[in-house]
């Protein structure tokens, strides 16, 4: 008989609001028991009954920032799997138009951060993948991210195809226990346990 796993499924939205080449980032430092404790993320939250992704993100942004979005794009669907015990389907948005006055957020501290400096923040490894996709203006995408119980990224797939993952090493060649996607490794210049070999074909002048 086929084994059926019953997993808790959540629905959520996340939005990165852009202004003057900066993203509005939320530093999650308020709640003690927070899976995102000390991480930097975008603005968003879980669906309320009967909401569409657009209705959810508009409400969450208003509640957490005080802003009303006037121009936004639905960029992708991110599937999170946490240690085979919980799943989350997250609708990812970006916005470049808003109005209203900012308010304090009870989820953390809001801060405008230069987009190029976002990579230096304490981010989830999977978030770096969709940041790269956003930076490259990839059309609407489906991204799957699988995490261990310890919060380590173990697997990623883009539009149903597995992405290449590298084990990051330190300067002495020792494993760090961190796994990064190929594009993120190249973006950050991280050391990894692979080597690239180029073969030169002799020409007439080489003898």
Regions found by a protein language model. Give the residues of each.
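Short, active-site-adjacent segments that bind or coordinate small-molecule cofactors and metal centers
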Residues: 134-154
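Acidic, metal-coordinating catalytic segment for phosphate/diphosphate chemistry
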Residues: 2-14, 161-204
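Conserved Nudix-box catalytic region and its N-terminal flanking loop in Nudix hydrolases
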Residues: 23-59, 63, 149, 153-160, ...
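Conserved hydrophobic "DFG−1" position in protein kinase catalytic cores
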Residues: 17, 25, 94-95, 112, ...
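Residue-level signal for well-ordered, solvent-exposed loop/turn and beta-edge residues enriched
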Residues: 22, 73, 152, 172-174, ...
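Unchanged
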Residues: 47-70, 80-134, 155-163, 204
């Amino acid at each position: 008989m086929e084994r059926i796993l019953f997993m808790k499924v959540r629905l959520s939205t996340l939005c990165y609001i852009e202004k003057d080449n900066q993203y509005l980032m939320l530093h999650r430092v308020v709640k003690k028991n927070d899976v995102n404790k000390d991480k930097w993320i975008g603005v968003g939250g879980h669906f309320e009954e009967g909401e569409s992704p657009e209705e959810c993100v508009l409400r969450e942004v208003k509640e957490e920032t005080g802003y009303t979005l006037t121009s936004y794009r639905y960029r992708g669907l991110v599937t999170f799997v946490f240690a085979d015990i919980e799943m989350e389907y997250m609708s990812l948005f970006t916005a470049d138009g808003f109005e209203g006055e900012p308010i304090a957020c009870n989820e953390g501290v809001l801060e405008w951060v230069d987009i190029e400096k976002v990579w230096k923040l304490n981010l989830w490894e999977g978030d770096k993948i969709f940041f790269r996709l956003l930076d490259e203006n990839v059309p609407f995408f489906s991204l799957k991210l699988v995490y261990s119980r310890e919060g380590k990224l173990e697997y990623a797939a883009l539009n149903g195809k597995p992405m290449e993952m590298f084990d990051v090493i330190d300067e002495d060649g020792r494993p760090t226990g961190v796994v990064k996607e190929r594009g993120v490794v190249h973006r950050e210049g991280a050391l990894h346990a692979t080597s690239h070999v180029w073969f030169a074909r002799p020409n007439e002048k080489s003898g």
